[in-house]
């Protein structure tokens, strides 16, 4: 399944979450798009709930179904709770860390920064959004990209940086200083539904 590249606000309204992180998509019309959006009261099956939860998380991180499932399978090989490990692996993606550092306003924009070669890891350019960032690795903006307007605009509006990452706005350098705890990740996601979905 290809990655969705259409209007994110439509997906946000359909899934009931803000993919931009601003919440603006849901302010005026907090219901699914379509003629019957405001009055839809369709009963959802257990399978439907599981699938909806999967779609929420997949769109939140902007992955294709194949990328999402591969990460899920990788999490299943780790010690600990499958669902929590899955959430943590998603959070450790390079494009997500770039987003968390405030270098991009959305994960989609962060993915573009990585794809276009604007980001380095431990001094080496990495253009793979799915690259798994390890604790202590240094994430930086390439010197040639330091004046990138998109990065500057994002830094102007970004204020919240999670405690599990550190960032120096002067040097445009940050790092993952520890593995995030489940309580610090998306509270609106019930990963148990996703584990159940793939266990069917």
Swiss-Prot record:
The protein's UniProt keywords, in alphabetical order, are:
Ribonucleoprotein, Ribosomal protein, RNA-binding, rRNA-binding
GO cellular component, alphabetical, reads:
small ribosomal subunit
- SMART domains in the cross-refs: Ribosomal_S4, S4
Q: List the disulfide bonds.
A: none
Q: Where is this region: Disordered?
A: 22-43
- GO terms (BP aspect): ribosomal small subunit biogenesis; translation
Output the InterPro entries linked to this UniProt entry.
Ribosomal_uS4, Ribosomal_uS4_bac-type, Ribosomal_uS4_CS, Ribosomal_uS4_N, S4_RNA-bd, S4_RNA-bd_sf
Q: Fetch the CDD domains from UniProt.
A: S4
Q: Name one GO molecular function term.
A: rRNA binding
| Ranges for domain S4 RNA-binding | 92-170
**Matching SUPFAM superfamilies:** Alpha-L RNA-binding motif
Role this protein plays: One of the primary rRNA binding proteins, it binds directly to 16S rRNA where it nucleates assembly of the body of the 30S subunit. With S5 and S12 plays an important role in translational accuracy.
Subunit text = Part of the 30S ribosomal subunit. Contacts protein S5. The interaction surface between S4 and S5 is involved in control of translational fidelity.
Which family does the record assign? Belongs to the universal ribosomal protein uS4 family.
Instruction: Spell out the NCBIfam families in the cross-references.
Output: PRK05327.1 (NF003717), rpsD_bact (TIGR01017)
Q: What is this protein called?
A: Small ribosomal subunit protein uS4
Gene transcribed to yield this protein = rpsD
């Amino acid at each position: 399944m290809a990655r969705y590249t259409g209007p994110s606000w439509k997906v946000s309204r359909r899934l009931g979450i803000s993919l931009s992180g601003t919440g603006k998509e849901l302010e005026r019309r907090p219901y699914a798009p379509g003629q019957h959006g405001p009055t839809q009261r369709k009963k959802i099956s257990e399978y439907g709930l599981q699938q909806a939860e999967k779609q929420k998380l997949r769109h939140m991180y902007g992955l294709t179904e194949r990328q999402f499932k591969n990460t899920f399978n990788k999490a299943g090989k780790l010690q600990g709770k499958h669902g929590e490990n899955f959430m943590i692996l998603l959070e450790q993606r390079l494009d997500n860390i770039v987003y968390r550092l405030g270098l991009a306003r959305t994960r989609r924009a962060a993915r573009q920064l990585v794809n276009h070669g604007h980001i380095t890891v431990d001094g080496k350019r990495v253009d793979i959004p799915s690259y798994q960032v390890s604790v202590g690795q240094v994430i930086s903006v390439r010197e040639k990209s330091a004046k990138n307007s998109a990065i500057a605009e994002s830094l102007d509006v970004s204020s919240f940086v999670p405690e599990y990452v550190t960032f120096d706005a002067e040097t445009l350098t940050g790092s993952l200083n520890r593995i995030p705890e489940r309580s610090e990740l998306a509270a609106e996601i019930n990963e148990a539904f996703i584990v159940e979905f793939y266990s069917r």
